[in-house]
Swiss-Prot record:
It is found in: Secreted. Keywords: Amidation, Amphibian defense peptide, Antibiotic, Antimicrobial, Cleavage on pair of basic residues, Secreted, Signal. Residues 1-22 form the signal peptide. This is Temporin-1PLa. Residues 23-45 form a propeptide.
Length: 62
C-alpha cells in the first residue's frame, strides 16, 4: 500500500510539472502572437466582421 501511495504521489508530481511547462509554453506562444502585427490584424478582423454582419442583417431584416 505504501508503494502505491508513493507511485501515485510521483505521478501527481510529474503531471503537475508537465502542466506547468505546458502553460508556460502556451503563454509564450500567446505573447509571440500578440507581438506579430499580422496576427493582430487577423484578430481585429475576426472581431469586426461578425459585428458588421449583425448590423447589416438587422438593417436588411427591417
Amino acid at each position: 500500500m505504501f508503494t502505491s501511495k508513493k507511485s501515485l504521489l510521483l505521478l501527481f508530481f510529474l503531471g503537475t510539472i508537465n502542466l506547468s511547462l505546458c502553460e508556460e509554453e502556451r503563454d509564450a506562444d500567446e505573447e509571440e502572437r500578440r507581438d506579430d502585427p499580422d496576427e493582430m490584424n487577423v484578430e481585429v478582423e475576426k472581431r469586426f466582421l461578425p459585428l458588421v454582419g449583425k448590423i447589416l442583417s438587422g438593417l436588411i431584416g427591417k
